[in-house]
Amino acid sequence: MCIRDRDHKAVFDGDKGPNTGGMGAYSPAPVLSEEMEREVQEKVIKPILRGMAEEGMPFKGILYAGLMITEEGPKVLEFNVRFGDPEAQAILRRLEDDLVDVALSAIDGRLVGELHWRPETSICVVLASKGYPGKYEKGKVITGIEEAEKVPTVVVFHAGTAVKDGKLVTNGGRVLNVTALGKDIVEARERVYEAVKRIQFDGMHYRTDIGLKAVKRLKG
């Protein structure tokens, strides 16, 4: 089954600056309509799976299709046989089933029926080191994660972190992934950015417009 999400590749607000591994994501993504989703299933996903099966290599696992929505419809940018990052952080916050059971069922060929998903909207905002995706410094002390996770539904996932002299410090370009759930994208954004404000490290950078296009679409 297809689960829709939207990534934000550019490092700065407004999709400006160089591309990164991803500065944030949200799910579901209203930019992909139900009609477009059916088109993706019929013209992209099913032919790939059918072709692999016909060649004696039936696919089992996670198939990530990176798409661009154009005036001519969805166009494929890339395929990955893994979750996207930070797409996974947003998508998996909505998964009600046990991920290990799902993965083992896929491996054994026992995965049938629909997975169960929370109805809420999920969002992930990446906190990055100054200079990313170029040269950046490491070893900056991180504070405020416990306070951030006091915001309802917020969970903070570590990426480029390490412990040095008993303190949590930065150890990569993308440092933390702050996630939240909400009844809609508006509430999810309010929660995640309230949590982001409680986290600090020297040179911390993040986009302030993750999910903003979905808010504008929601409000018409």
Give residue spans per PLM region.
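Internal nucleotide-binding/catalytic subdomain
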Residues: 4-88
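Generic C-terminus detector
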Residues: 162-165, 169-220
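Structural motif
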Residues: 17, 24, 74-75, 122-125, ...
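Active-site "cap" helix and flanking loop/linker of ATP-utilizing ligase/carboxylase catalytic domains
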Residues: 40-63, 80-151
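Short beta-strand/turn micro-motifs at beta-sheet edges
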Residues: 12-14, 112-114, 161-168
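Generic long, charged, amphipathic alpha-helical segments
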Residues: 138-177
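Residues in well-ordered beta-strands of folded domains
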Residues: 68, 126, 143, 155-160, ...
